[in-house]
Amino acid sequence: MKTWSYLAALATALLLWTALPASAQGLQPVPPLAARVTDNAGMLDDKQKAALEGVLADYEAKTGSQIAVLLVKSTEPEAIEQYSIRVTDAWKLGRKGVDDGVLLMVAKDNPSSLRRLRIEAGRGVQGVLTDAQSKRILQDVIAPHFKQ
């Protein structure tokens, strides 16, 4: 009986913890989606941001798929994988019913244990943008820019 009471109390505590907003848990808040490129880390100048916005707008006009870029200083204490899922849940990228949105996430000051780069792809593009392709894009295209 004591074990059952303990498990019930633990389950209740976990349920209440997950119901708390991210800010109450000490997690980084998800910024509002205001543009295709959200640079909260100050990594891009205005010209770079405008150029990237243009490329993403053209891609969306041609394919219908929506790509957003989020640049933040850090996702600590949360790993980039969990943070990017919270972002895609909040932003609802892609077309409704198609789920073809993609998030490119960069957390420039994350420690290597939390990773700094992530591509989060909706189910509607996972056949075209596989995990292996995402990894290759991050390693071969995006990561080299951090070494410059």
Indicate where each model-derived feature is located.
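Bacterial N-terminal signal peptides
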Residues: A8-P21
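Positively charged n-region of N-terminal signal peptides that target proteins for export
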Residues: M1-S5
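Folded, non-transmembrane soluble domains that reside on the lumenal/extracytoplasmic side of membranes
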Residues: S23-Q148
